[in-house]
Amino acid sequence: MADVFEVQDEIARKIAEALRIKITPQEKEALAVKPTESLQAYDHYLRGRSYARRLTRQDLDFSLQMFSDAVALDPEFALAHAAIANVCAYFFCHYDREPSWIDRARAASEKAVALRPDVPEVMVAQAWILYSRGEYLDAARILRSVISRKRDCEGAFYLLLRCLFASGQYQEVAGLAEEAIEASGTDYNVYVPILNSLGALAKTESRNNIMQRAIQAHEAHLREVPEDARSRSLLAGCYADMGRPEDSKREATMAMTLRPNESSILYNAACTFCSLNEKADALDALAKAWRAGFKDSDWARGDPDLALLHGEPEFERLYPTKA
C-alpha cells in the first residue's frame, strides 16, 4: 500500500509508452507529483468524490465530511480543498442561497490555489464559484483551459456543458457531446446538459440516440450502486421519454423513496411527470423542489423537459425571467 502512488505513476507511464503518446513536460510533472502523502487522506478523498457525483443533499453532506476528513489528515492536500470548494458552490446553487456557502467555497478554493495553483482540479473549483455567481462565460473559459490540459479532469466537462447550457449555447453543447461522454467515463451527470440542449434544438434523432446511451450508462451504474437515487431519478426521465411509462414510474418512485426531501430528486420527478403529460403532478413536484432549495431560474426555464409548464402561473412565480 505504501507504494500505491508509485504504482499509479508507473502504470500511467507504461500506458503512454505502449500507445506511443507524447507526454508534455507539464504532464510529466503532474505524473511525478503525489496528490498527498497520506493514503488514508486519499481514501477519504476518493470516497467523497463518489458521493459528490450523486449531487443529492445527503450525498453532498457525506462527501463534504469525507473531504473535510481528508484535509484534517493532510492540510496540504490541494485536491481535497478544491473538492470542498466544489461541493460548497453546488450547495449554494441548488440547496441553500446562504452567502456563507460561497464564503466557504472561496476560502477552500484559495487554500487549494495557494498549494497547487496550476492543478486542473483546483481550476475547476474556481470555475464552480464563478458559475454560482452566474458568470458562465468566465467559468467556461477556465474549464476549456482545464480540458485542454486534462480531458478527463473530474467534473470539468459536466460543468462546462452546464455553463454553455445556462448561457443558451445549445449547439456548442451538442458539438461537444461525444468528446464529453468519452472523457467523463462513468460520470453519468454529463448526459443531462447534452440531452437538454438537444431537446432545445429539437434534434429528436440525436437526442434519442444519446438517451439510449444514457439508459445503458444508468442501468450499468445501478447494478453496481443500487442506492443511487439521482441515477434512478434520471433513468426515470429517460424511460418516460422513450415510451416506457411503467418503468419510469417505478424508478421515480424508488428515487423519491430513497431521498423524499431532495430538491434535485423532486425536480427530476417534475421533468418525468411532464414527459408523461401529468401537469398537476409535475407542478406539485416542482413546487416541492423549489421549497427544498432548487431555485435556479436559468436552468429551469431553459430545460425543455419542463416546457409543459411554461406559462403556468405557479411556474412563472417560482422561476421568473431574470431582469
Identify what each model region corresponds to.
Residues M1-Y191:
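Acidic, proline/glycine-rich low-complexity intrinsically disordered segments
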